[in-house]
């Protein structure tokens, strides 16, 4: 099947997802370390705001280094809580708390985050990621 929005390699139809489902899909793909599929969830450019730093990226794969994360002890991440703050036809604001976990399921990082999503022809896309505090995705 090759209709727009259908991705047979993942079996997901992005355009039918709600903003909250898009955030859950982000975590699933992050846990799979699937950089190409992660790139499809993000708008271009997208913005990462952590602590007092604001950065601009053209793709998610430009921002993340999964080997760096594995070397830091990361095995997978999980959403602890999630809440929709706002949604209209064009934008959505989702806040959530998440953890990074080790192979033994020990929590090695926890943070509050907010995703600003925008509606595009292919579905909801993450435009801005706000992290309350510091967070690293790579050595850069």
Model feature map: region roles:
Residues 57, 101-104, 134-137:
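A short local loop/turn or secondary-structure capping micro-motif enriched for an aromatic residue
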Residues 108-140:
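Short beta-strand edge/turn micro-motifs at domain boundaries
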Residues 42, 98-100, 130-132:
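Short beta-strand segments enriched in hydrophobic/aromatic residues
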Residues 15-18, 47, 63-106:
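Surface-exposed, charged secondary-structure patches
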């Amino acid at each position: 099947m090759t209709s727009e929005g259908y991705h047979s390699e993942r079996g997901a139809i992005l355009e039918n997802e709600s903003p909250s489902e898009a955030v859950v899909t982000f975590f699933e793909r992050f846990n799979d370390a699937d950089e190409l599929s992660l790139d499809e969830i993000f708008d271009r450019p997208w913005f990462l705001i952590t602590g007092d730093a604001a950065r601009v990226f053209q793709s998610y794969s430009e921002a993340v280094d999964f080997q760096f994360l594995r070397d830091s002890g990361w095995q997978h991440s999980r959403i602890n809580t999630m809440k929709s703050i706002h949604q209209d036809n064009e934008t959505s604001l989702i806040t959530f708390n998440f953890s990074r976990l080790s192979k033994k399921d020990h929590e090695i990082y926890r943070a509050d985050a907010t995703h600003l999503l925008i509606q595009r022809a292919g579905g909801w896309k993450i435009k801005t990621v706000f992290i309350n505090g510091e967070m690293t995705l790579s050595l850069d």
